[in-house]
A protein has these predicted regions:
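N-terminal small-residue-enriched
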Residues: 1-235
Length: 235
C-alpha cells in the first residue's frame, strides 16, 4: 500500500510541464485590490496557516492579544463559512486514531455558520481554559512533550459552482496553488504558483508573481461564496 501516491501520475506531470511553459510567457500581475477566487489547494494553505494556527490553544492561552482576538462566539464571516479540523478521516496526512495523549481523534468544528465555536486542545490547555480536549496533542517523538497542533483542517464544502463565483467579476484574479507565504498574527501574505485574470466573468490570460496579502478577519468577513467542489489534496 502507498504506491497509489506515486503511480499513474503521467497526466499530473504533463500538466505541470505545460504550465511551466505557459508561465515563461506570463506577465507579472499589476498590483492592486481585486476580487479573488482561490483554488482548493490555496484555500487549504490559507485556512491552515492564517486561521488554523490561531486556533491552537497553547498559542491562544499564552498570548493575550490572541485571546482577545479569538473569543468563542465572535462572528468571523457569513453563515456560509464553516471550518473544521478532523484527525479521524482515513488516509490523510494528519490522520491518527488517537493523539499523543491518548485522546481519540474526531471532527472539531472551529467555525460554524460564520461564528467561532471551538479551538484545538491538548489535555493541558483544555484544563487551563476550562474546555474539552480535542485530540490535537502531537509530539515529534518520545523525546518531546506533546504540543497542540492541527490534524486535517479545511473549509467545509459550499454550494457555489466555479461559474457562479466568476460570472459577476468584471476584473479579478483566479489564484492557484501555493508557492509560499507567511503570517504575523492576523496578517498574512501568500504567493500563488500561478494565476489567471478574470475579465467580464471569464477566465482570461495567465499571470505570475501573484501575492495575496491582507488581514485574516477582514478576509473571512469578505467571503461571499464557497465552492461545491471540495477535495482533499495530499501534497
Amino acid at each position: 500500500q502507498g504506491y497509489e501516491y506515486v503511480l499513474d501520475k503521467d497526466e499530473l506531470v504533463r500538466k505541470a510541464a505545460v504550465r511551466a511553459v505557459e508561465l515563461l510567457g506570463a506577465r507579472p500581475v499589476q498590483a492592486g485590490q481585486y476580487p479573488v477566487v482561490i483554488d482548493q489547494l490555496l484555500a487549504g494553505v490559507f485556512i491552515h496557516e492564517a486561521f488554523g494556527h490561531l486556533s491552537e490553544a497553547d498559542f491562544v492561552y499564552e498570548n493575550p492579544k490572541a485571546r482577545k482576538m479569538m473569543p468563542l462566539g465572535r462572528r468571523f464571516g457569513q453563515d456560509i463559512l464553516n471550518v473544521y479540523d478532523d484527525g479521524s478521516i482515513p488516509n490523510l496526512r494528519g490522520t491518527t486514531l488517537y493523539d499523543d495523549e491518548g485522546t481519540p481523534a474526531r471532527r472539531n468544528w472551529l467555525i460554524q455558520n460564520g461564528v467561532l465555536v471551538g479551538r484545538l486542545h491538548s489535555r493541558q490547555t483544555a484544563a487551563k481554559m476550562g474546555e474539552t480536549a480535542s485530540g490535537n496533542a502531537r509530539a515529534v517523538n518520545y523525546r518531546f512533550a506533546p504540543i497542540v497542533r492541527m490534524t486535517n483542517t479545511a473549509i467545509d464544502n459550499g454550494t457555489a459552482t466555479f461559474e457562479d463565483m466568476i460570472k459577476d467579476i468584471k476584473l479579478g484574479i483566479y489564484a492557484c496553488d501555493a508557492y509560499g507565504g507567511e503570517t504575523q498574527l492576523e496578517n498574512f501574505s501568500f504567493s500563488s504558483s500561478y494565476a489567471y485574470m478574470i475579465r467580464d466573468g471569464r477566465i482570461a490570460e495567465m499571470v505570475k508573481d501573484v501575492i495575496l496579502a491582507g488581514n485574516l478577519f477582514t478576509t473571512l468577513g469578505n467571503i461571499d461564496m464557497i465552492g461545491n467542489d471540495f477535495k482533499w489534496l495530499n501534497t
